[in-house]
């Protein structure tokens, strides 16, 4: 397991990696990352608009799930994308001041928008870190793994989570 995680860290340009079949889905992996980093009183800002439904439950913004981040005392805010589907860098700079996490959903999810490019992820990271240098830029990279020569962690993201069921597992991984 350790060697596989070392290889995955190299492939993604990351300091370290957790590459485990124990993560049952992308949402499970994202949840582990969010609960591992955020603490009561911290604020996360979703900078690509409202996250998709399963993650909305993890955060607590749908009001139907128990044991979510908001119940844990994490504050939530969001910045919608601009009308053309690109990040609102001015809005990101305004809302990320004082925040612990800048959260980027790279893929379109269930929205009618294009996936974010690495250049856009880098621009978002720069905008957030310009106003809050110690902010953690996290990327939901589900469906984004191995689609380009670099990964978000090589373009300004501090933390990235994805799903083995999708691109890395080629659709044949039984979990993760």
PLM feature segments, named:
Residues 14-23:
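Early transmembrane hairpin of solute transport permeases
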């Amino acid at each position: 397991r350790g060697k596989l995680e070392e290889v995955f860290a190299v492939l993604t340009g990351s300091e370290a990696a957790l590459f485990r079949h124990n993560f049952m889905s992308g949402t499970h992996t994202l949840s582990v990352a969010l609960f591992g980093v955020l603490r009561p009183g911290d604020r996360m800002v979703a900078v690509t608009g409202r996250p998709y439904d399963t993650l909305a439950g993890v955060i607590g913004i749908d009001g139907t799930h128990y044991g979510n981040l908001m119940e844990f005392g994490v504050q939530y805010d969001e910045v919608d994308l601009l009308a053309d589907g690109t990040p609102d860098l001015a809005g990101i700079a305004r809302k990320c001041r004082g925040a612990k996490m800048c959260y980027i959903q790279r893929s379109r999810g269930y929205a009618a928008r294009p996936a974010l490019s690495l250049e856009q992820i880098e621009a978002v990271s720069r905008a957030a870190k310009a106003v809050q240098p110690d902010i953690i830029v996290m990327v939901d990279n589900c469906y984004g793994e191995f689609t380009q020569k670099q990964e978000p962690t090589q373009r300004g993201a501090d933390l990235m989570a994805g799903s083995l069921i999708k691109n890395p597992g080629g659709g044949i991984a039984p979990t993760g």
